[in-house]
Amino acid sequence: MGSHRTLAVTFAFASLVGVSTLAQAPPYGIGRTPTPEEIRALDISIGPTGEELPPGKGTVKEGGQLYRAKGCASCHGAAGIGGSAPNLKSKDPKNPDVWARGRILPLRAPFATTVWDYINRGMPLNQEGTLTPNEVYSITAYLLFINDVVPEDTV
């Protein structure tokens, strides 16, 4: 019986020492704390009217060129479908239920401003924030065009 009690006390002590050691483990040291300016640049909300968007413009034609040049096609497929990343073109763009489901693309995006904001904040993957507002406007126009939301001459 004494050896069981000794074993239990030893185990309890080791557990407490182990937990306190883990609690004081140094941080991993990955990344850095963002500056106030960096936080302020991302701390925006984009509503459906687009009032909060920066000035800029883009065309469907420019968007198609940028879609290929910036590497969008390498993940999402040459025509916005069939890549390793989510499809950006509806398989049935004429389906009226696309709007009813709250989407203008196969992604969950109820407004064109949502598409703009997502691209601006999150694309290209691992190079987020590298697109200019005009590039984002152009790529957004291209995606809306390939989904039959806007005509090709949209600016």
Regions found by a protein language model. Give the residues of each.
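The canonical Cys-X-X-Cys-His
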Residues: 63, 69-79, 139-143
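Gly/Gly-Pro-rich "capping" loops immediately C-terminal to redox-active cysteine motifs
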Residues: 64, 77, 81-124
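C-terminal capping alpha-helices of c-type cytochrome domains
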Residues: 38, 117, 129-153
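Electrostatic cytochrome c docking/interface patches
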Residues: 29-68, 124-128
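Bacterial N-terminal signal peptides
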Residues: 8-18
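Sec/Tat signal peptide C-region and signal peptidase I cleavage site
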Residues: 19-24
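Bacterial N-terminal signal peptides that target proteins for export
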Residues: 1-9
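Stable alpha-helical elements in mature extracytoplasmic
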Residues: 38, 59, 71, 111, ...
